[in-house]
Amino acid sequence: MTAPWRIIAVGRMRGSEEEALFQRYAARLRPALTVTEIAEARGSTAEIRRRETSALLAALPPACIVVAMDLGGRAHDSEALATLARRWREQPLPVCFMIGGAEGLEQPVLDRADHVLSLGPMTWPHLLVRPLLAEQLYRAQAIATNHPYHRTGRPSG
């Protein structure tokens, strides 16, 4: 059986449009994608970073594949992400995607990561990263199963 996938993210999405969009894709994923939400810290920028970093690292299971979502990470096209996702599925460990808050991820989280991925060079609100990631993981699953959701190449126009 494939180990579960998990998002560990700063911020609460309760009842938001972002949550509805996230659920739309997360519900289609196999293995299931679960979310652990970390409360957004308050205080100075340094204090926020320290507290959120500590909480994110504390939420990790002892053994897992850690994927940090960070602007400075490597951006993959959908086919390359599908290849990575297939490799992760072949492992007996759960995959944990780490998403920081408005201040991003600090170096200790990036150092703990096995992979650092980016959704591209643009900056995204941290609450939008979850639905974007869920959609890309669903797309990777569609590529792996030859589902028509993903259309290879660019549309002609």
UniProtKB/Swiss-Prot annotation:
GO terms for cellular component: cytoplasm. InterPro entries: Alpha/beta_knot_MTases, RlmH-like, tRNA_m1G_MTases_N. Keywords: Cytoplasm, Methyltransferase, rRNA processing, S-adenosyl-L-methionine, Transferase. S-adenosyl-L-methionine binds at residues 100, 119-124. It catalyses: pseudouridine(1915) in 23S rRNA + S-adenosyl-L-methionine = N(3)-methylpseudouridine(1915) in 23S rRNA + S-adenosyl-L-homocysteine + H(+). Its EC number is 2.1.1.177. It is found in: Cytoplasm. GO terms for molecular function: rRNA (pseudouridine-N3-)-methyltransferase activity. Belongs to the RNA methyltransferase RlmH family. Homodimer. HAMAP family: 23SrRNA_methyltr_H (MF_00658). Specifically methylates the pseudouridine at position 1915 (m3Psi1915) in 23S rRNA. This is Ribosomal RNA large subunit methyltransferase H. It comes from Granulibacter bethesdensis (strain ATCC BAA-1260 / CGDNIH1). The gene is rlmH.
